[in-house]
Regions:
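FIC/Doc superfamily catalytic core
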Residues: 1-295
Length: 295
């Protein structure tokens, strides 16, 4: 299926990861373009405010370690904030010590976050509820995202951590969600994102926001399904089959390649010669015959 292509294609995954980081930061007024974000993450020099560059590097670091995070660990949540906000805010990796107003992307105050003295216990409660509730994870993750934004536990970085944690919760249910560009779809519907938070606040419960986020997730899935996988050349497919064979066998011989790829002895010989020249295989003596192993 196309979502499997997303899980297995490193090119698609990298593209979506970069889009995710670009979008999550653009929502927070980061000025870098998608091309500049790509350049920063490729180690190139980019002329831009140092703060914006640091935000990109920090975000990439935490998204890169997504698989290692436990969504039900307070320590991991604080670690994620510390990584995301290191060098950017004084209280990186700590719950805020002062009051905070929750603002939209235009600077309008939507509501005021929970009083700081109640933040740790409310966050503990929210994490425990998310872990123990029997609601489907699709719903629970949206509830967590909404309640997290209401509490607004940090002095800064709440939006990007809330979206990161939503992705993390979903990715533990199905790994494909680690690579879905949910943040990009939110960026496309930014005004509605804040309106949904606003409406839910006015109603005193998160139904509007939950329905909005379910729509966003559906749109991200639809986009992934419609996304054409990057076509692989015949050579790449052959190399993948040989590499897979060599993960369970120490060496491969001409006859193995014939059977594996359904080719003639001459073609098998040519394939092995090319892969050796490319530095992927190394030629070794195997009794009276030549064989090949991973270089």
């Amino acid at each position: 299926s196309s979502t499997q292509n997303l899980s297995t294609s490193p090119i698609l995954r990298r593209q979506n990861r970069i889009r995710t980081i670009y979008s999550s930061l653009a929502i927070e007024q980061n000025t870098l373009s998608l091309e500049q974000v790509t350049a920063v993450l490729s180690g190139k020099r980019v002329l831009a405010p140092p703060k914006d560059i640091a935000e990109v590097k920090n975000a990439y670091e935490i998204y890169d370690h997504l698989a290692e995070l436990n969504p039900y660990s307070m320590d991991d949540l604080l670690l994620a904030h510390r990584t995301m906000m290191q060098g950017l805010v004084r209280e990186a990796g700590e719950f805020r010590s002062g009051p905070v107003g929750v603002v939209d992307n235009k600077g309008n105050v939507l509501h005021f976050g929970t009083l700081p003295q109640y933040v740790p216990s409310l966050m503990e409660e929210l994490i425990q509820w998310t872990e123990s509730s029997s609601l489907p994870i699709l719903i629970k993750s949206c509830v967590f995202h909404y309640e997290f934004e209401v509490i607004h536990p940090f002095s800064d970085g709440n939006g990007r951590i809330g979206r990161l944690w939503h992705t993390l919760l979903l990715s533990k249910w199905n790994p494909v969600f680690a690579w879905l560009p949910v943040e990009s779809i939110i960026q496309d519907h930014q005004a509605e994102y804040y309106a949904a938070i606003n409406q839910s606040n006015a109603q005193g419960e998160g139904t509007v926001f939950i329905e909005f986020m379910l729509g966003i997730i559906k749109e991200a899935l639809t986009e992934a399904i419609n996304e054409q996988p990057v076509a692989q050349s015949k050579e790449e497919v052959r190399w993948m089959k040989i590499a897979a064979f060599l993960r369970t066998n120490y060496i491969i011989q001409n006859v193995d390649v014939q059977n594996l790829l359904n080719v003639s002895p001459a073609t098998a010989s040519r394939v092995l010669h090319t892969l050796t020249k490319e530095g992927k295989l190394a030629k070794v003596r195997n009794g009276r015959y030549w064989a090949y192993k991973l270089a």
